[in-house]
């Protein structure tokens, strides 16, 4: 225990003893200065690149500047497509969502697709035709059945309330108009105006009293 006590005493003496003058140093050991300042410096070294680029809005501007670069790369892809006709044929079936991305740069994307469709994807259209033919007979049967009863029900219900609604709307604004004029005279503004000058009179009375005194 004695050794621990001596160690604690030495630490206390070291922290309490003043240090030689040094520029930028308070002259004594301060926990907030000796420990926190190195941490702040270390954090500033780690986080330095982020403020150099700027805050988030600046990052958004950088992304906007990169957009034209992407548009420049798209024509390169168009130039590469004619060289890779054969590998693109099997990929056209699942890569249907890429079609909306292609017409963005210009109409040039449509011309190669039109040439590819009649030449290569003819076998791809064949499986789609029977699939599209099968759901057609099933789909019309289902909607026609519910639509027939719904069509007569929908016009009957809205027509009845629509007819009384137009006269009701003009009638509603009329009743609030007459009560508005009586509300204005009910306000206590006119009686408050004469009270204001009455409050000013006692001030003059005080001055007169002072003169009298």
Swiss-Prot record:
User: Would you say which domain of life the source belongs to?
Assistant: Eukaryota
Task: Quote the subcellular location field of this record.
Answer: Secreted, Extracellular space, Extracellular matrix
Annotated region (Disordered) at 96-213
Bias kind Pro residues: ranges: 161-194
Q: Does the keyword Repeat belong to this entry?
A: yes
Presence of the UniProt keyword Repeat in the record: yes
Q: Where is the signal peptide?
A: 1-16
Record's comment on post-translational modification:
Phosphorylated by FAM20C in vitro.
Q: Which UniProt keywords apply?
A: Biomineralization, Extracellular matrix, Phosphoprotein, Repeat, Secreted, Signal
Q: Which GO terms describe its cellular component?
A: collagen-containing extracellular matrix; extracellular region
Tell me where in this chain the PTM Phosphoserine is found.
32
Annotated coiled-coil segments of the chain: none
> Pfam families recorded for this chain?
Amelogenin
Q: Which GO terms describe its molecular function?
A: structural constituent of tooth enamel
**In what ranges is there compositional bias, type Low complexity?**
96-105, 114-160
The protein's predominant localisation is secreted
Q: Which GO terms describe its biological process?
A: chondrocyte differentiation; enamel mineralization; epithelial to mesenchymal transition; osteoblast differentiation; positive regulation of collagen biosynthetic process
Subunit annotation: Interacts with KRT5.
The family note in this entry says:
Belongs to the amelogenin family.
Q: What does this protein do?
A: Plays a role in the biomineralization of teeth. Seems to regulate the formation of crystallites during the secretory stage of tooth enamel development. Thought to play a major role in the structural organization and mineralization of developing enamel.
Q: Any idea what this protein is called?
A: Amelogenin, X isoform
Source species of the chain = Bos taurus (Bovine)
Name of the encoding gene: AMELX
